[in-house]
A protein has these predicted regions:
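Histidine/cysteine-enriched polar flanking segments
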Residues: 1-131
Length: 131
């Protein structure tokens, strides 16, 4: 996450420093700078919107967008970063009001980490269990 598009933002200095530190310590890696959206709720409270809250799913990148001018920039950046993936923009402007976004609502469970007994219960449709 970068904030190049919002130099007056309170997060600008910290994100700029992070980008510079990454360039210094990881020069062999390409950085892709996503813009910083600015979204507030009905009371004017800033919401934690970020284009970096994306999710990779097989050959697709599910990219949160927020009905902001920066959406198009974020899509272009992600197409550059993932040229062999389909970029699927997902409107998260309502979801971010719950203080999370696309990646936040997903649950990644690594293969072979759940107990067989738990999986058996889930296959039967049981979603609440105690063990």
């Amino acid at each position: 996450q970068a904030a190049f598009n919002r130099p007056q933002d309170s997060h600008y200095a910290g994100l700029k420093a992070l980008c510079e530190e990454c360039e210094q310590y990881l020069p062999q890696h390409t950085q892709y700078h996503l813009p910083l959206p600015y979204i507030v709720d009905e009371d004017g409270v800033r919401l934690p919107a970020s284009y970096a809250n994306f999710l990779i799913c097989n050959d697709a990148v599910l990219l949160p967008i927020y009905k902001q001018d920066e959406d198009a920039i974020a899509i272009d950046v992600m197409q550059s970063a993932y040229p062999n993936h389909v970029i699927e923009p997902i409107d998260c402007s309502v979801l971010v009001k719950q203080y999370g976004s696309l990646h936040c609502i997903s649950m990644q469970v690594p293969t072979n980490t759940l107990q067989a007994s738990v999986l058996a219960l889930l296959e039967k449709g049981v979603s609440i269990y105690a063990q």
